[in-house]
From Swiss-Prot:
Gene behind this protein: pyrD
Keyword Flavoprotein listed: yes
PANTHER family in UniProt: DIHYDROOROTATE DEHYDROGENASE (QUINONE), MITOCHONDRIAL (PTHR48109:SF4), DIHYDROOROTATE DEHYDROGENASE (QUINONE), MITOCHONDRIAL-RELATED (PTHR48109)
Reaction catalyzed: (S)-dihydroorotate + a quinone = orotate + a quinol
Protein name: Dihydroorotate dehydrogenase (quinone)
Biological source species: Leptothrix cholodnii (strain ATCC 51168 / LMG 8142 / SP-6) (Leptothrix discophora (strain SP-6))
Length: 345
């Protein structure tokens, strides 16, 4: 149990610029992880082991990519009780992302808007951080590594970046996620279209099979998709995942829709909206994916989870596992065991 209840620290953090608060929090976790001060935010891990995509997860609740883009805080974040953590998105080369300000709170709706743009230190630094993390994986936690393309890489050459990133992260990942759904990298979502997706996933699957032979183990590969898809688009994506032998899907990323936050301060800021307003759209995509892909295909649900009941709604829609991010910002570490208990059994 955390020694400092999050409701006491949240007003201080929410008094800061959102990105500054984010960096302060990550910096503190990075500094004090694996020390006695980790007890300030640690939570007991709820045991609920489950096998998905051939991996044994300690429980069904994970951290979504984007919170720890550079993999600096894997052990510290793991102390919150997660069964699995996904870090990144990492690109082959470091890049600053979009101009600031680029993160905005909408507290009336427990939501965020961000247009960060895959800001990260690049593959070499990312892998060094991942290799320094020890306690989370030693205690059974699983690690997903999320990959993307550099902003300067033309969309027609996107596969080159993904292949470089896949080869780099493969030896260090329990699973790899291919992020083709961030709205904050120009034209990235075009990779979700029929021919482009088929070509990209075919190239990645060919490389992954070669890497499996090279490293003597098969690392599952997931694809993360957007909530802003109609039924026909989801149907095509599901068929393309199957056709290319992709192991699983993560649904969903942030949304461009603003209906649920219209009229609020910052609602018209460009970027992806996350948090409570995304729950219904994300669950709709999850439910259709489950219908299209069948009962055994691995689905990780993410988007709008701020309570145990929200986590259960993801399971009811068809998700095997559930991730949180924005909910952690609004609810704090206690959200993790709450969701794990709600998903148990």
């Amino acid at each position: 149990m955390a020694l400092v209840p999050y409701p006491l620290t949240r007003p201080f953090l929410f008094g800061m610029d959102p990105e500054a608060a984010h960096e302060l929090t990550l910096g503190s976790i990075a500094r004090f992880q694996n020390t006695p001060l980790q007890c300030l935010w640690s939570q007991s891990r709820i045991a609920d082991p489950v096998t998905v995509a051939g991996l044994r997860f300690p429980n069904r609740i994970g951290l979504a990519a984007g919170l720890d883009k550079n993999g600096r805080c894997i052990d510290g974040l793991g102390a919150m009780g997660f069964g699995f953590i996904e870090v990144g998105t990492v690109t082959p080369l470091g890049q600053p992302g979009n101009p600031k300000p680029r993160m905005f709170r909408l507290p009336e709706k427990n939501a965020l808007i961000n247009r960060l743009g895959f800001n990260n230190e690049g593959l070499a630094s990312f892998l060094a951080n991942v290799q320094r993390a020890t306690s989370f994986r030693r205690n059974g936690g699983l690690l997903g590594l999320n990959i993307g393309k550099n902003a300067v890489t033309p969309i027609e050459n996107a596969a080159d970046d993904y292949l470089i990133a896949l080869a780099g992260v493969y030896p260090h990942a329990d699973y790899v996620t291919v992020n083709i759904s961030s709205p904050n990298t120009k034209n990235l979502r075009a990779l979700q279209s029929d021919a482009a997706l088929d070509a990209l996933l075919g190239a990645l699957q060919t490389r992954r099979l070669a890497l499996a032979t090279e490293h003597g183990r098969s690392v599952p590969m997931f694809v993360k998709i957007a909530p802003d898809l109609d039924e026909a688009q989801v149907r095509v994506i599901a068929a393309t995942l199957r056709h290319n032998g992709i192991d699983g899907v993560i649904a969903t990323n942030t949304t461009l829709a603003r209906d649920a936050v219209a009229g609020l301060a910052h609602a018209d800021e460009a970027g992806g909206l996350s948090g409570a307003p995304v729950l219904a759209a994300s669950n709709r995509v999850i439910a259709q994916l489950r219908a299209e892909l069948g009962g055994a295909y691995p689905i990780i649900g993410v988007g709008g989870v701020l309570s145990g009941a929200d986590a259960r709604s993801k399971r009811a829609a068809g998700a095997d596992l559930v991730q949180v991010y924005t909910g952690l910002i609004y609810r704090g570490p206690a959200l993790v065991p709450e969701c794990a208990r709600a998903l148990r059994g």
